[in-house]
Each structure stands twice: as structure tokens, then as C-alpha cells.
Amino acid sequence: MKGAVVVNRIINLIIRCLLAVIVFVLFLHSIFSTSFIGRAVREDGSTYGRTLNIPDSPWKHLIVFALITAAGVAVYRLYRKSHIAERFSAHAERNIIIFLTCFFIGLGVLWIALTQMNPGSDPAKIYAIALQWRDGDFSAFEEGEYLFCYPFQSGIILFYYLLSFVFGTESYIGPQLVNVAALAVVYVLLTLLARFYWKEDRQISLLIYLALICWVPLFFFITYIYGILPGMACAVGAVYLAARYLETRGYAYMIGSALCIGVATVLKMNCLIYLIAIACFMLYDALDSILFCGSDNGKRRQWIASVGFVILMCFSVWGCNRVTEQIVEHLSGYDMPEGEVMISWVVMGLSEAPKGPGDYNGYIGDVFSGNNYDTELAAQQSLADLRKIVKRMLSDPIDEGIPFFGRKTAYQWNDPTFISMERMRGRKSAIEMLPSVKSLIEGRGSVTLSVIFNYVQTLILVGVLLYLILNWNSRNLYELMTAVVFLGGYLFHTFWEGGASYTIPYFAIMIPYAVKGFCDWVRAASRLIDRRGLKLRANKKTTFCVVGIIVVVLAALRVGRSNLFHSTIALDDGQEAVMQYYHLSGGE
């Protein structure tokens, strides 16, 4: 039993320390600079999309935090005096969530009706191939074509191919409606997970659901038919069912979770990150059961079941992807190709690209075609190129290594909208969109949204930090399940091909932790206020938070004078970037 407690504390400490460091780095990015997709000029005078950075004021963020804290304390004290919690039943809460879900779905349908956008970029390729399959055209599998290079995309293409039998081939609305339903499922599941994590604090589940709905960057991805939201819904479903298994030890939840993660990886291979996170907790559960079991046969069966859960998930991923391959091979008449080598994605993820560090730059295709589509030769060249990159970064970490990862972090995580508006710009629409809708996508409305969510992003990161600080001694390791998914997503995309459209799901799943952190913070701040209004009570943890935030901001301001800080955190691309961000050099 003592060994189990020690293991729990060690693992808990490692996870919380890693989370604290990563979230703190993102927090510094958020208060010192803001990233967005602007325009850069080539030597020939043509322009292209490029991530630009403008300076931000940490003092403004601190003022917003103070105002939100004051408002939160005032509302919380009124809430306590009104005794609403005593009259607020679980049935009433469930009805409110159902109502909000219906409202959210209606809002999503309305947005789709107001935009009716055709897919662009990669989603356009994906959906075009799905429609080609409807016509019996499987040329995308021929040498050098899309599925010859990216066979792992056949799962999402098969998904849209099947959807076309339901919604028809003349409209893109159907898959977008599926995105709305998937996002609603994600938000409900994250709320249910919060109830599992913090059973003693069930009142915050409604606040978490409201916060998720109000955070609109992910909402705008409902028009982006690339498998992100359906895959996320299945993956979060797998996490939720795994949590239910841990709570009840019901084998039905184990089977459901394994099936969900299998389907998720068919839709989006990046969902393997969720599998790894769940597997880590199941293996910990097995270890915990072994250390506790002694002569208890029930505990012994429990660790065997947890290990079996991991094996079942791996089998499900293999099985679902294998079944998908066989269906596609049967439909197309082509054998599934090997595709581009995975190591080439790491090389690309550690290289410069037109849009931003680590973004797509054509390397994976060039190294594949340049070696006559020989995967072994392509892997050898990619490995050699990777060694050169690592050697260059290690030989000059101050000017090459650290600044690259700083700029890549900003590119992936420091755009307040997570390029959600950029993903809608320039796409054709089946209708003439209203001026207000256009403004929200590419005009002054988009600027207003970006400014607002710049502060919201900081508040979310501060909320997560507050959660970690105020719950540092919590022994409930399982409440970190989705946080470990975020941790995996951050580490993976630090080295893999990156972009805000890849990282936004991992940021969204941290919102429940931010709400929990702010609620704990507001309650702690309220306890500091005496009935007479000004007398402070001794509360070491809360005092530490207040002093810590002030010290961190002051220290960061002082450190901010260094060149390294300016090349990694306080990024600034000059006045032209500011003009572009605020649309000062042009109209709507």
C-alpha cells in the first residue's frame, strides 16, 4: 500500500510539473505577443500567407484577470447568499444542458446556412476524391497521386464517400452538419468527464459546458470537412468510456472505448495520441492494483482486466484500420500503397515553411518522388536530413534551436482564433453572404473576435495554472486523463508537422481545467474577504497565487529585455504586421 502511494505521488508530480511548464510557456507567449496569419511579399512581388506576430501588453492581460476575478467573487458571493445550489437539482441541470445542446446545434445549422462554403485546400482534395469514388474513379491510387502518397487518408475519404449516399453528391452541407453533431458530442462528453474528475464539485459542470460553447474558435471549424471533429468526438468518447470503466469496472465500457478509439484512428490518425494517453492510465491502474492487491483476488482480476483493456484497444485500432483497408481495396481494385515515410514528417516539422515553422513545405512529397517512390531510400534520405537539422540546432541552440521552437510554438498555439477564420477566408460560397457574416470572417468583425479571444486565451491558460497550483496535492491522478492528451498533443506537434488546426482540439480539452481553476480561485479569493469587507485571513496557497502572478509578470518583463526572449516569446514582426492585424491598411 505504501508503494502504491509513492508511485501515485511520483507520477502525479511528473505530469503536473510537465503541464505547469508547458502551460506557463504558452501563458508567456499569450501575454507578450499575438500571432495571426498575415501576408508576406516574395521577391517577385507576389504575396503568400505567413504567420506574423505583434507585441502584446502583459499589463492589459493582468488588468483583465483582476477584473474577471473581482466579477467572479461578486457573483459567487451573490450565488451563496441566494442558496440557488440548494434548489438546483441534477434533473434541472440535465434539462439546461439538453436545452443548451439544442441551441448550440441550431446555432451551428444557422452558421452553415449563412455561409454554405465549399471546402478549400486539403478538405477540397479529400471530398473531391470521395466524389470520384462515387463515379468509379480511383485514379487517386495511381503512382504519384494523392492516395498513393497519403494512403492513411483513405479512412476519412471512405467516411465521406459513405456520407454521400445519405446527403447526395451535389452539396457540402451534409458533412458540415455531421461536424455540428460531432462538436456537440465532444462538449457534452467533456462536461461528463469533468463530473467524473471532480465529483465533489458537480456544480461547475454547467459552467464548463457554457465555457466550451462560448469558446467559438473550434465552432468555426464546423465548415472544415477534414475529419477533425468526427475523429475528436470518437476519441473523447473513448476517454469518457475509459473513465466510466475505471469507475464501474464494467466490461461494456471497455469494449465501447476500444471501438471508439479504433474508429477515431480511421478518421484521423493523430487520434493515436488519445490511445496512448488512455493506455498510460490503464497501465498505471494495473500497477496500482498489483501494489494494492495482496491476496485479494478481485484486485488481481482488476489489473489483468486493465492490461487486457490496453491490448483490446490496440487490437481495435489494428482491426478497424485493417477492415477499412480491405473495404477500400475491394472498392478500388488497388492494393493499399505504403505511402510516404513517417520520418519525413519529422524532418518537415523541424524545418521552415512559407506559412510558419514546421508547417507543410512540400518536403515529404519531394523526398518521396525524388527517390522514385522507394520508401527505403526516402527513409534513408530523411534520416540523413534529420541528422543535419539536429546537428545544426545543437551546434547553435541560442540562434537556431531555441528560437525555432519558440516561433513554432507561437505559430501553433498563440493565434487566439487558432486560424479558424483563416480557414474560412477565400472559399467560394453557394450564396451571397451577408455583410455581417463576411465581416466576421475577413473584416473588422474578425479583428474584434481575435482581440477578445486574445484575452480569453490568456484567461484559459491562467485558469489551468490556477488549477494546477490550487490542486497540486490532489492524489486523484485520473482527473488528469484529458490533460495528458493535451500533453501528448503538445509534444507530438512540437516535432511533427504543425499548425493551429492540428493543435486546437488539444487546447479545447483544457477548458474544463481552466474553469475548475478559476472556480477554485474565486472561492479562495472570496474566503479571504472578511464579513466586514477588507480584513484578510491567512491562506498560504491563495496568497502564493497572488504574489506568484505578480512576481512572474515583473520577472518576465525584466527578462523580456534579452534578445533570446524577443526571439522566442516576445515576438514582433514590426509595424506592418500591426497594420495587417488591425486591418488599418485596408477596408473590409
Model-assigned labels for residue ranges:
Residues 177-199, 237, 462-466:
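Transmembrane-helix motifs of polytopic, lipid-linked glycan transferases
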Residues 150, 154, 166-188, 447-455:
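Loop-to-helix entry region of an early transmembrane alpha helix in multi-pass inner-membrane enzymes
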Residues 328-430:
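Membrane-proximal stem/loop segments at transmembrane-domain junctions that anchor or position
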Residues 220-231:
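Short acidic/glycine- and proline-prone juxtamembrane loop motifs at membrane-interface regions
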Residues 198, 236-253, 286:
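Membrane-interface transmembrane helices that cradle and orient dolichyl/undecaprenyl
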Residues 115-131, 135-170, 378-383, 398:
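Extracytoplasmic catalytic/substrate-binding loops of multi-pass membrane glycan-assembly enzymes
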Residues 50-66, 173-174, 178-179, 404-489:
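Membrane-interface anchor segments at the N-terminal boundary of transmembrane helices
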Residues 1-110, 304-314, 538-550:
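Start-transfer (signal-anchor) and selected internal transmembrane alpha helices
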